[in-house]
A protein has these predicted regions:
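Short, well-ordered beta-strand segments
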Residues: 219-221, 392, 421, 491
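Alpha-helical solenoid repeat scaffolds of the TPR/TPR-like class and their adjacent stem/linker regions
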Residues: 1-384, 396, 435-441, 454-465, ...
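Conserved donor-binding/catalytic loop of nucleotide-activated donor transferases
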Residues: 463-465, 482-494, 510
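Nucleotide-sugar-dependent
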Residues: 302, 470-480, 493-501
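Short hydrophobic signal-anchor/transmembrane segments that target glycosyltransferases
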Residues: 239-246, 391, 402-416
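Hydrophobic/aromatic ligand-binding patch that stacks against planar heteroaromatic rings
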Residues: 309, 411, 482-483, 506
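Acidic, glycine-centered active-site loop in nucleotide-sugar glycosyltransferases
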Residues: 487, 502-514
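A conserved nucleotide-sugar
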Residues: 247-249, 409-439, 444
Length: 573
């Protein structure tokens, strides 16, 4: 009869297999060890960790749960909390993280997971409490905690310490933890944005730049998960029907869509392919089978993207467009569809993608002049004073920063009968804005929050605004187009990176360069001038209603699509 293998020998063999990356063999050793040592919680923990690395969270949960039944530890509770976060079971994740913190009140990893779960549920007060505590206990060294805290502070318009924390995060640029979207929303430094994007890209990709023969009829694919009530859909929904079907075969590869929007798009393309229910590897193989010449990714780095579907075999040329205003930092994209306002040629060094310029604004719109709609609404219906000048901003709260809100408050202080009309994003941001205003001597009645409503109702009420006030670091994009289409002037401050120059691009395209400013002082002066000079304000509004060439071109989707196709033909040839 052979002697029982010692636990230490099993542990040595497990560690050897792990050091060589042999996860399957390590798991076999663990399973063999558990036959002899079925009550050893560390074996289950090691097994759970390996399954988690392999992406098998079902077995990971099974092993961690077994370990917990043998010995209750903060680490296992936290590991289970992470699994429930991945499954979006945030209430369960919160419960497990709280148990871990009861064992160790200074356990920062559990505090982070608790904050992350609360943030995902929109419980920003609890999220801020625990993310702040995690940062403090960690001496602000872990960029994961910093990233979460800044995101929460942005969403709640709590700017007390945000500049200082942002400077600390700048020291971690390049560690691959900060998401590029957070970077472009907190700083307009293209250099910083680019470093963050490049460090976020984990795949080692080298594109084959050899010339490849295109199909006689160009096969053009779009990858998109936004055919639903989403800004991308609202902008691009009417483009597809204008593609030249005699020279193009247009394919849509869609995930996360609503039936009505799917049906509308499907009627205007060669083939609509639903990849929602298949994993990235299978979706990638599916796309490869269509032998695409060009693939345009409409999501890139935004929430719910499927960037991992794209690889070297997806298409002969791959383009980034519309969804993400900046460089992806990935070499998988050959081009970014852009314009000379949002990305001057001097900024090419901060992009992995080559610039593919549209002649006017890069941003497509649905071609509809909203202000022509006849539906009647009035200020009283929306809690707005009848005799008033309404200064609106319907951007999400994360786009508002302290410098811009102070500017808006100064404008209210220096003008009469003006009211600030903002989107009610969340209760905490609303209360924080009220608090900032009151400390500056502004009656809170002069700041009016509008609830979220369906798009049609929103556009009807938007026409009641006199001036749209743009945000600074991250402009309005779809919201700026909405204002233009409702004949509401937009005052913007042109920044240094893509996201802070989009409104300038749109205003230039509609012939309203005079609404583009270059510093906060000029921005403030222009808004005050418009509020006090009704003749000038009416003149600007009329420019958005008249039949001039700028507006004809802006709303001419057929022309926009032709110009897009000209760029695609350049690539093909």
């Amino acid at each position: 009869m052979s002697a029982k293998k010692l636990l230490d020998d099993y542990v040595t063999d497990i560690q050897l297999q792990l050091s060589e990356g042999n996860f399957d063999l390590a798991l076999k050793e663990i399973q063999n060890a558990l036959i002899s040592y079925p009550t050893n919680s560390k074996l289950y923990i090691n097994g759970g960790n390996i399954y988690k690395i392999l992406g098998d969270i079902d077995n990971a949960e099974l092993y961690f749960t077994k370990a917990l039944s043998i010995h209750k530890s903060k680490e296992v509770l936290n590991n289970l909390s992470v699994i429930h976060i991945e499954r979006r079971n945030y209430d369960q994740a919160i419960s497990l993280a709280r148990e871990a913190i009861e064992i160790d009140p200074a356990y920062v990893d559990a505090m982070y997971n608790l904050a992350l779960s609360q943030d995902s549920l929109g419980n920003y007060d609890e999220a801020e409490k625990y993310s702040s505590k995690a940062c403090s206990l960690n001496d602000y060294k872990d960029s994961r905690y910093l990233v979460l805290l800044i995101r929460i502070l942005q969403n709640t318009c709590n700017w007390k310490d945000i500049d200082e924390i942002s400077k600390i995060l700048d020291q971690h640029v390049g560690d691959g933890v900060e998401h590029p979207f957070l970077s472009i929303s907190r700083t307009d430094s293209e250099e910083v944005n680019f470093k963050v994007a490049c460090s976020w890209e984990k795949r080692d990709i080298q594109r084959d730049n050899d010339a490849k023969k295109f199909n006689k009829k160009i096969k053009l694919g779009y990858l998109c998960g936004e055919f639903r009530n989403h800004p991308t859909y609202h902008l691009i929904k009417n483009l597809f029907k204008h593609h030249d079907q005699s020279n193009l075969e247009v394919y849509i590869f869609s995930y996360i869509h609503n039936d009505a929007e799917k049906e509308y798009i499907e009627d205007n393309v060669y083939k609509f392919v639903n990849i929602n229910d298949i994993d990235n590897e299978k979706a990638s193989e599916l796309i490869k089978g269509y032998d695409l010449d060009i693939l345009i990714d409409l999501a890139i780095l935004i929430t719910n993207n499927r960037q991992d579907v794209i690889n070297n075999d997806s298409a002969k040329k791959i383009i980034s467009y519309l969804g993400y205003p900046g460089s992806s930092g990935s070499k998988i994209y050959d081009y970014i569809l852009t314009d000379q306002i949002v990305t001057p040629i001097s900024q090419q060094k901060y992009y992995t993608e080559k610039f593919l310029y549209m002649p006017r604004t890069y941003q497509v719109n649905d071609g509809e002049r909203i202000y022509l709609n006849k539906k009647l609404t009035n200020k009283k219906d929306h809690g707005l004073p009848e005799k008033s000048i309404i200064l609106s901003c319907f951007n999400q709260s994360f786009k508002i920063d302290n410098l811009m809100l102070n500017c808006w408050i100064d404008i209210l202080n220096e003008t009469q009968d003006t009211y600030l009309w903002l989107l009610e994003d969340n209760e905490i941001s609303k209360n924080n804005i009220y608090s900032y205003a009151e400390k500056s001597g502004i009656d809170s009645n002069r700041i009016i929050f509008a609830p979220r409503v369906n798009r049609s109702d929103h556009l009807d009420r938007l026409k009641l605004s006199d001036i749209t006030l743009d945000t600074r670091i991250y402009n309005g994009h779809t919201t700026t187009t909405d204002s233009v289409q409702c004949a509401v002037p937009v005052v913007t401050l042109m920044g240094n990176h893509f996201a802070s120059r989009v409104s300038s691009s749109i205003l230039q395209a509609v012939g309203l360069d005079e609404l583009i400013t270059e510093n906060i002082s000029d921005y403030k002066s222009l808004v005050i001038k418009l509020t006090k000079d009704s003749t000038y304000l009416d003149e600007i509004k009329n420019k958005l209603r008249e039949e001039n060439q700028y507006l004809k071109d802006f709303y001419d989707l057929k022309k926009f699509t032709k110009e897009l196709e000209n760029n695609l033909n350049k690539i093909a040839n």
